From Swiss-Prot:
Principal location: secreted
Keywords: Calcium channel impairing toxin, Disulfide bond, Ion channel impairing toxin, Secreted, Signal, Toxin, Voltage-gated calcium channel impairing toxin
Organism listed in the record: Scolopendra dehaani
Keyword presence, Disulfide bond: yes
Presence of the UniProt keyword Signal in the record: yes
Protein name: Scoloptoxin SSD346
Length: 209
């Protein structure tokens, strides 16, 4: 039956084209240890910068400690489960509470995508001119992952993880407020934690609460 054969062919093609990553997911989401790691590693990187321990970068008086946020994490997880490895559309980088979220994404091999992603984003610091700290601009080498990770006012963080059967992991981390605003400072410059509005972090000296 030609009609039946054509219908089956269309259905098969729809399944192949529309399957995306969703049908090939092996692991969804982050366990407790992963959440702890994805929060601790960026805070330690922020701490290095805030304390003036990163060569070529000034210290920061106002860099906040990052905190995990389940609402943002759920939004980041939805982005990962679309099966499309590209920045989430700005219209989808928001929740009922947060109107605009910044984002970093990473693709790598399981089981250690988190340290690789954080270290990879941070390595962009080598391309950041000191002038960009005072006034962000995106021209030249790519360093937007690094600058988002150390954006001073960013505090709540949430990440989503998808691992496919080919062992590729897709990590989406979203931040509030989103950073990388042109002509805005990444952070103020001055003695570490000297401009903390709500006190200093006890866990990460050099950062603010």
């Amino acid at each position: 039956n030609i009609l039946l054969s054509s219908t089956l062919f269309v259905l098969l093609m729809f399944q192949i084209i529309g399957s995306g990553l969703g049908c090939d997911m092996k692991v969804r989401g982050l366990d407790a240890n992963m959440k702890k790691m994805i929060l601790d590693l960026p805070n330690k990187k922020r701490q290095i910068v805030a304390n003036g321990q990163q060569s070529g970068q000034p210290s920061a008086p106002n860099m906040k400690e990052l905190h995990w946020n389940d609402e943002i994490a759920a939004n980041a997880q939805r982005s990962g489960e679309t099966g499309v490895f590209e920045p989430t559309a700005k219209s989808l980088r928001k929740t009922t509470k947060y109107s605009y979220l910044g984002e970093n994404i990473y693709k790598g091999f399981y089981p250690d995508p988190i340290p690789k992603s954080v270290n990879g984003w941070y390595e962009e610091v080598k391309d950041v001119p000191p002038a960009v700290v005072k006034s962000f601009s995106s021209g030249g080498p790519m360093f937007g992952h690094y600058t988002q990770m150390v954006w001073a006012n960013t505090e709540p963080l949430g990440c989503g993880l998808v691992t496919a059967f080919d062992r590729n992991s897709y990590l989406f981390c979203q931040y509030d407020p989103g950073g990388n605003y042109r002509s805005h400072p990444i952070y103020k410059q001055g003695p570490p934690a000297s401009d903390c509005k709500n006190g200093k972090s006890s866990k990460y000296p050099g950062l603010c609460n």
